[in-house]
């Protein structure tokens, strides 16, 4: 089997998705040993510089084994949208293919996968002044109150969002205040991810057969992050002076909980932080799995299998062979 020129073969995009802590990085590195791939990160947290521990960012040694793209793009004070991701990912994928290699999209930000597969509606750009005003309102009124306001002007979107989903409530109200139109009016009405495979694309999904295994792994990984210095990392971010708890970067799982723990006292209550961080990560994993179940064309590998990475490699070889034979 050879995929040295994937643009001429039947498969031009390979995706590796799964919930947080499912072993995507290890599987991607295993794939890089046998296929001519370059990794395109599909992770909304990895775009931020200076956020390494809490994002489980691939190490310098791991990134030296295979080229990685869309990591460390912006400062954590900046915003990064799904539309920006699509533009950056498409550019990176075209460059990878031009080098005769295969783009390997790896991550768990399912909204980014949806935007790339299904396209993204032409939403108005972010308005920093409006966002700042909404942040200020949230600090005095609380996000549930703003969610209630959203329900009066855009009940369709509000019904999809939790009252404390600050980032999405903020964006929906920002669109309403900027345009006078509800966010839901910009969408085609279909919020699920692609139910049919995009052309020349294959998706391997790492999913647990035992949810308890994933929960245990999440707890162990968050404990390891604390041991590795997550609290110190958040202290450094707080000391910059240009960040606050309502920024998208600081709402990332782990960072949000560590920031709140430091607000409550320094040194923080590490036992409570461990419990809250692991719980938030479990909720994230649940949402990711819900998205993945809406993609019936995916091919699954049990992430709790001892040889999960080897199974991913074998399946990827099979998928490439199948597409080459059909081309």
From Swiss-Prot:
Task: State its Enzyme Commission number(s).
Answer: 2.5.1.75
What is any one GO biological process for this UniProt entry? tRNA modification
Q: Which residues bind ATP?
A: 18-25
State whether it acts alone or in a complex, and with which partners, per the record.
Monomer.
GO MF entry, a single one: ATP binding
Could you name the domain of life of the organism this protein comes from?
Answer: Bacteria
Interaction with substrate tRNA: region residues: 43-46, 167-171, 251-256
Under catalytic activity, the entry for this protein gives: adenosine(37) in tRNA + dimethylallyl diphosphate = N(6)-dimethylallyladenosine(37) in tRNA + diphosphate
Q: Which Gene3D superfamilies match?
A: 1.10.20.140, P-loop containing nucleotide triphosphate hydrolases (3.40.50.300)
Q: List the cofactors.
A: Mg(2+)
Its protein name is tRNA dimethylallyltransferase
Gene coding for it:
miaA
């Amino acid at each position: 089997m050879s995929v040295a020129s994937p643009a001429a073969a039947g498969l031009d995009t390979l995706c590796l998705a799964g919930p947080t802590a499912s072993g995507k990085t290890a599987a991607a590195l295993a794939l890089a040993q046998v296929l001519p791939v370059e990794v395109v990160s599909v992770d909304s947290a990895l775009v931020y510089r200076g956020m390494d521990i809490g994002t489980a960012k691939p190490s310098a040694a791991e990134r030296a084994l295979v080229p990685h793209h869309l990591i460390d793009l912006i400062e954590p004070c900046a915003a990064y949208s799904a539309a920006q991701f699509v533009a950056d990912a498409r550019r990176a994928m075209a460059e990878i293919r031009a080098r005769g290699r295969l783009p390997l999209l790896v991550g768990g930000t399912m909204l980014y996968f949806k935007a790339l597969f299904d396209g993204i509606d032409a939403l108005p750009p972010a308005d920093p002044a409006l966002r700042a005003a909404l942040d200020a309102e949230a600090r005095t009124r609380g996000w549930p109150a703003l969610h209630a306001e959203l329900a009066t002007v855009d009940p369709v979107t509000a019904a999809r969002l939790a009252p404390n989903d600050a980032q999405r409530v903020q964006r929906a109200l920002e669109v309403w205040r900027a345009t006078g139109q509800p966010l839901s009016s910009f969408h085609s009405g279909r919020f699920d991810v692609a139910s049919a495979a995009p052309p020349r694309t294959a998706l391997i999904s790492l999913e647990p057969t035992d949810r308890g295994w994933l929960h245990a792994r999440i707890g162990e990984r968050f404990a390891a992050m604390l041991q590795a210095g997550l609290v110190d990392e958040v202290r450094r971010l707080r000391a910059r002076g240009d960040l606050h708890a309502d920024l998208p970067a600081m709402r990332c799982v782990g960072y949000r909980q560590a920031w709140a723990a430091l607000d409550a006292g320094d040194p923080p209550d590490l036992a409570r932080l461990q419990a809250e961080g692991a719980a938030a990560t479990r909720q994230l994993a649940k949402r990711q799995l819900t998205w993945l179940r809406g993609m019936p064309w995916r091919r699954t590998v049990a992430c709790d299998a001892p040889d999960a990475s080897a199974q991913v490699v074998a399946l990827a070889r099979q998928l490439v062979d199948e597409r080459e034979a059909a081309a």
